[in-house]
Amino acid sequence: MAANRHGGHLPLPEGLAAPTHRTVIYYAKCDFSPSEERCVNRFTGRPGPLTLMRDRSNVEHMVLITVKTDEEDRNTAEQNQARARSRSQETKKILTLLAPQIDYNPLTLDSLDHNLGQRAVIFSYGPNLHQRLTTSALELQRACKTLKLHSILRIESGRHFTSKAVQYVVENEDDILTAALIGENNLYQINTETLSATRLVTDALSWAEYKPLDVTCNAVMKPPREGVQPMCLVASSPVSDYNFNKYLMITPSCTAISLHMGHPYPRVSQGIFHVHSSTRTMGRQCCDYLFHSSLLPNGNTTAFACGYYVTSTTGSGSIPTSVNEQILHAASAQGRSLNNLGVPVVSGFLKPLPRCSEVPNNVITHVSQLRTASERDLNLCRVRAGQFVAAVGAYDPTSGPDKSPYLYRDSIDSLNRAIQATKLFYQMCETPCVSSYQREFGSCSTLHHLLALVSPKGMTVHISRLPEEITKALRSVPVLEEDTVCAFVSGYFFNCFSSQLFLVIDDKVKTTPSGQIHFTDILKKAGNLCGAPVYILGRTCNDIGIHCVNDLYHPRDLSVLDSQATSSMTLTVQPHASVVSATLQPQEPHEEDESIDWAMFGTSSTISNILSHPAVASKSNIIRRLDRCGNGLIAQQPGIGPSDAPVSDYAIICDSSMFPARLENDAQSIKKISKQEAQRAYAQIHKWFGTEKLFLNTISAKVIALGEQAYKLSRNPIVGVKYAIAEAITNIMFGPDCVLEDITLTVAAHWNKQETAALYRVLFACKEMCRELNVNLSITDASDSRDTPIQDTDAANTVVVTASARVTSIERITPALKKAENALVHVCLSKELTLSGSVFENSFTAFSSHLPDLDTSKLRDMFYAVKHLISKNLVVAGHDISDGGLITTAAEMCFASTFGVTVNLPSALPALMYLVSETPGALLEVPKEHLSTVTTLLSERGLTWYAVGTVNNVKNLSIYDNGTHLLTESINILNSKWMSYAEESFETCEPHIESMYRNDYGNNAMDLKHLEDLCTHKPLQLYTCPSHPVSVAVLTFPGCPDPVATLQAFANVGFLSYPISTEFLLQGNNLNAFSCLAVSGSSAFEEEGTGTRIAIYTLLQCDLAKNCLKEFFQRPDTLSLCCGELGTQLLAACQVVGDTHPSRGDISSNPESWTLELEPNASKHYESLWLNFHVPQTTKSIILQALRGTIFQDGLWQVLGLRYKHDAQEYIMQQNGTIAMSYHSAKINPYLYAMHYPRNPSGNSSVAGICSKNGRHLALLVEPALSFHTWQWQHIPKPLVTSPWALMYQCMFLWCVKE
């Protein structure tokens, strides 16, 4: 579906044929996947057409390597032998690099199926080998070209399931296994017996028919005709300044921090920020990121919020196992793709839509993204005809939406390289030289994006300048008709989607000391440095449309304008007939006046069912599989409290993690230090601390919050969207101080294209409410739902609202309860209890009740009343009331803390109805001595409020109605109900893990020993050394996210932080100017472990780079802090850490000689967890010397373990003091190392950090830069002013100055 191969009417199969090749299959042992385990359990010992014998089932990894072969009659025997040896060596190299993908198990050419006999059950499956390469295979293919492994054409992964049946093989055995093992996933059976003789596809080409633009998007986001404003502009409502670029953009000011390669970090400037939101059926992961980047070019996206709707659910909202897998695959593909761009996911939701039509693979995704840009980087040059049109990045086309398990997702490695190349190009040009970056809305074809790029003009495209894959296929056929060429180019280029970046470049030149250089040549140079292909497609012109010039066999010189060039094909967007009709009016909401017999519902069972409903239950199964704060800018992430409960109402994203004093170069806060003073300070830790408060309430940040009410929208769209706005407002209400005028609401709609008239009314309802609230409103996206007939009222119509605001403080209120005996106050917009569209109504009733309208003035009054109470410290905790009602809000506040609550229900209201009502409002924790003050103020504002109970310290939830006891339940039991969806998801969709320890997470104790008083009461002292400035080289790898957090952490303590590309080392430069080397992060490959090995292998293959690193490590005045996958693997590969045997001399690029390997975590997935760490008292590490003996926590992203190459390697390191850090239990006993997942991510070695034998070089699996400040911590067990992690960097600065 995502990779159709060929247009049937084109006579060109030979042009797409791969070189002569053969495919070899390698097998390696592995564990059962969840679907394989279910298959074995289902068919083992069970009567039916297929019965498997007990304990005879196995599964293996398959690595399928397609290798180029030669036609033997054209070569001599010696040549054939030499080439065979070369192919064998190249295959061996790539298999070594693929080791993490197969869990380091040995590969063999023989499967385990050879001794199963006549009743053998054999089923191999994987990607479709007759379509374009999967994303993982494409990344590996490009890596092979870089490494000059020329014989390797394609590398794919598959699974080989074997068993033995009780009966002889039945005819439909393959159909049975296909349904059990593949299901609705985009996988195919592979015939391993005939594969070696089968010709496979070995290129990236994909065929697509022309597809018009999204109808709903056209109707809302684009002008219906010339001279008429688009609906998105008409329905928007600005309060503050705005501009118009595709739609109305509210762009508040902020501080912009930028990275310039080879220059000290950071560069600070005045900037703007903007939030773009979109909701669409799961398709391309980065299409909206690319669109937003075109609005704010050269900027930085700093946060994403992701939500998911699923329509294939039961009436109660429960999610079948197969659909659950699709959700997790979608969330992983979407979230991890965004994470690999270097951006965390900070908020989200999951909502099953049980009353919608069930469509397989119909996961609807919402993405809101926050992006900042420097105002000076937004300047464009003038638009003129004759400018160059460029495409930057690898051409990885897809022909349509992908589906689970998303094998054809966007290659983030390629996209990162393209982004890095365009930013480097802009920096190298030093003047505005781009006139357009524009893209079309949504997941569109290349044709639509190019037309948007040059609008309102046109462009010529020279076929000879298209990506190499296309021109090579065309040139392989001697004679082609003009129509065939045009059809080929349309199907394989213009009609496909690609994540390339498009830009229009000025046709002028830049004057340099060495002469004049064209801007296009600068772009090509930037592309070469970053590993991103650059295609100069053609030039702009005044004639509307895309005009193709067939110069395939006689390429034209684009530097010379050729007015004689004739077009062989002109492409434009085909017009649409409007679907909006005056006779098509939205249906009135269907309401049934039926009363509920509340006596039928038990309080305990109802609460349990609501807490376990997927819309309400914990989403930790999704949230903990995504990076939540990997750029170091997140002051409030989803997890709250000691148990990391994902209940936060909002997220806070700081402009920078730099101390304001550093950004402003404040001489009063920064103390100058000499080499001699540094020597004294290094030995006296108390001098590392000062008295100047470094973070006042003036830190610049943004706060964002989501609002969505799909259930209520299905009852009454006009009123339901107001509830979504109310949820966004009540969520952001608990964040840092702001006023309504500062808030911008961005709205994204996903709507049935047959009901656009109803969507118009919904958008105008948004506008009316926002005007009454006096908040900014911007409509940023609209898209079609799956095709449904007009009479089908079960279409998934949704509107998601994202609230954002700039704030000057990170002080806020969270749902975590603070103190026993504090009062609980329920404040709401109305005395009317809202059941329509509630989780209760969806779960327990078969009818729809009336959805009451909202009083906007009451919402405004409640917002300001709560803000006032918070500012006076009269409210110490709070949580909005939304899905699940008051009882869910109270329970979640308990889950986020160590307290319980006692609820005393108002006497005039039905007890259970009151508990499950979803009338917008909030539950406030108020110090008991201030209760009367709070309630008086709420009454004066005309708000409805109820004093509903108190906080208790017995960890129970007790409910009383008029003094009658209704329920007392342990918080732990309620939490297990709330966690049930996540647990069920884990059990059905994850590999086998010891369930006994799976929930041993959170509640980390901390023991700072001698540092406790200092870290609790004193801030870090900021130093600078003008006489001996010290510099750190922060190494960046092509295709990997920029190490922003690491750069900022080093700059915070006084280093001159330089981002240095690996190209700097590959070109033979040295590191003599640097006292410290830092590496962090991981590869952006889909298979991150393999990508990391390839990145290190590529670097160390170069003798110049190896010698540079060796010289640096051998200098006595250097330190290294290498973190995460890339850092740890680099130090191990250079034999700096982990080498317990006599040194073997030179650094080797061969992975088999590396001293350590990285082991994936036990869940086999990326995870973001907050774990405890222990620094041994005996460690030799200089960097950690101040922290010896301490136990404290940090966030761990892409949790890993270490795999040793030699016996007793860990014991020897323990004895020689080179173990620097270990995973630890929740307790402060120094001997209680973490032995099991998740506290020990791999479940094997507990070692999390290793230093060199001289103590100067440190490899950590953790990223300490993400916890440099206490505000970056998910939870602080004790009040801290200074993070212990900051002392590492302070120690390094003082050591480097004194040395």
UniProtKB/Swiss-Prot annotation:
InterPro entries: Class_I_gatase-like (IPR029062), FGAR-AT_PurM_N-like (IPR055181), Herpes_virus_tegument (IPR010077), PurM-like_C_dom (IPR010918), PurM-like_C_sf (IPR036676), PurM-like_N_sf (IPR036921), Tegument_herpes_virus_N (IPR024346). The keyword Cell membrane does not apply. Transmembrane segments: none annotated. One of its GO terms (molecular function) is phosphoribosylformylglycinamidine synthase activity. Keywords: Virion, Virion tegument. Gene3D superfamilies: 3.40.50.880, PurM-like C-terminal domain, PurM-like, N-terminal domain. This is Probable membrane antigen 75. It comes from Saimiriine herpesvirus 2 (strain 11).
